[in-house]
C-alpha cells in the first residue's frame, strides 16, 4: 500500500530505528534501494544545509542545498548534483536521475544528496551581467570572436564527488572504476540569436541545464555550422546528456559542439574536474 505524505513525515522521524525505516520505505518504494550510496537515514546528518551560490544576486536566486530531506521549493529549477537519484513529490514521489533536473513550482525535494536551486527573479536588465562582475569570455580566450556577447559568472567550487566517468557519460550502467572529482558550477548569459562558439576542448566532464530562456546544445562533424548533425532543444529546467566519451585516464573526447541562444538565455554549467 502506498505511504501517504503525512505518514511519510510521521514515520521518518529520528525516533525510528534506521533499519526499520529502511525496510518500511523500501517495501513501499523499491526504487529507494538505488539511494544506498547516500545514507539519508542517518539521524546525525545535518539536513537541508543551505547557502547561496557564488553567482547569486538581486537578479538570480541561486542556492545549494545538501543532505536534502522534505525541502519545499516555491519556484526554481532544481538540479541533482550527485551520482544518486533525487526523489521529488509528495503523494506521488518521482525520480530525478543523477545530473538531471526539473522545474518545481510549489513542489518538494523528498530526498537528495546535493541540489542546486536556481531561478531568474528579475529579468529586466538581466543583460547587464557584465556590470555585475560577470566576465566576457573574450577576456579569457584570445581567439574568442570579438563580436560574440557571451558572459560567464563567478564559479563556485561545490566540493568533492565520487563517480565512475563511464557511468557519468552513459557508457556503462554499473560502476567499476570510481574516481573523485571536484564539482564546480557557473552560469552563462547571452542575448537571443547568439552563436556561442563551436569548440571541442574540455579537460573535464560537463553537462548544462537551462535556467532562463530557450537555447540549444548542438553537435557538428566539423568546426562549421553547416555540418550540424544533432540539435538538442533546451527549455527551462532541462539538462542534456553528456556529450563526451571517456578515451583514457582523465581523457574525455568531445564532438564539435556549441550552445546557441534562441532567446536571451541563462544556463548552468556543471563541471567535474579530475
Regions found by a protein language model. Name each.
Residues 2-66, 114-184:
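A short, N-terminal "cap"/entry segment at the start of jelly-roll beta-barrel domains
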Residues 53-92:
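N-terminal ordered "arm"
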Residues 61-64, 184-205, 219-224, 234, ...:
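Conserved short histidine dyad/triad with adjacent acidic residue
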Residues 68, 207, 230-232:
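Short, surface-exposed secondary-structure edge patches
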Residues 73-77, 112-116, 204-206, 265:
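Short, surface-exposed beta-edge/turn micro-motifs
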Residues 78-82, 202-221:
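Short, conserved beta-strand element in jelly-roll/cupin
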Residues 85-107, 222-258:
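Short acidic-glycine-tyrosine-enriched beta hairpin
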Residues 114-123, 253-274:
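A short hydrophobic beta-strand segment most commonly corresponding to one strand
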Amino acid at each position: 500500500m502506498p505511504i501517504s505524505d503525512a505518514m511519510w513525515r510521521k514515520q521518518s522521524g529520528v525516533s525510528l530505528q534506521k533499519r526499520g525505516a529502511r525496510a518500511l520505505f523500501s517495501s513501499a518504494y523499491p526504487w529507494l534501494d538505488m539511494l544506498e550510496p547516500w545514507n539519508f537515514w542517518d539521524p546525525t546528518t545535518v539536513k537541508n544545509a543551505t547557502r547561496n551560490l557564488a553567482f547569486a544576486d538581486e537578479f538570480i536566486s541561486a542556492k545549494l542545498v545538501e543532505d536534502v530531506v522534505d525541502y519545499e521549493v516555491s519556484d526554481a529549477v532544481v538540479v541533482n548534483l550527485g551520482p544518486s537519484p533525487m526523489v521529488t513529490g509528495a503523494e506521488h514521489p518521482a525520480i530525478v536521475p543523477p545530473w538531471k533536473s526539473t522545474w518545481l513550482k510549489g513542489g518538494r525535494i523528498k530526498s537528495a544528496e546535493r541540489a542546486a536551486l536556481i531561478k531568474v527573479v528579475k529579468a529586466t536588465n538581466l543583460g547587464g551581467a557584465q556590470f555585475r562582475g560577470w566576465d566576457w569570455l573574450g577576456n579569457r580566450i584570445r581567439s574568442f570572436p570579438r563580436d560574440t556577447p557571451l558572459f560567464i559568472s563567478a564559479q563556485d567550487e561545490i566540493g568533492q564527488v565520487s563517480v565512475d566517468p563511464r557511468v557519468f557519460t552513459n557508457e556503462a550502467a554499473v560502476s567499476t572504476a570510481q574516481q573523485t572529482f571536484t564539482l564546480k558550477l557557473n552560469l552563462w548569459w547571452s542575448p537571443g540569436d547568439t552563436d556561442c562558439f563551436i569548440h571541442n576542448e574540455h579537460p573535464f566532464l560537463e553537462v548544462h541545464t537551462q535556467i532562463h530562456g530557450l537555447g540549444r546544445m548542438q553537435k557538428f562533424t566539423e568546426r562549421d555550422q553547416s555540418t550540424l548533425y544533432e540539435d538538442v532543444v533546451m527549455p527551462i529546467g532541462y539538462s542534456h546528456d553528456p556529450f563526451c566519451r571517456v578515451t583514457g585516464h582523465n581523457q574525455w573526447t568531445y564532438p564539435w559542439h556549441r550552445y546557441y541562444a534562441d532567446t536571451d538565455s541563462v544556463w548552468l554549467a556543471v563541471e567535474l574536474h579530475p
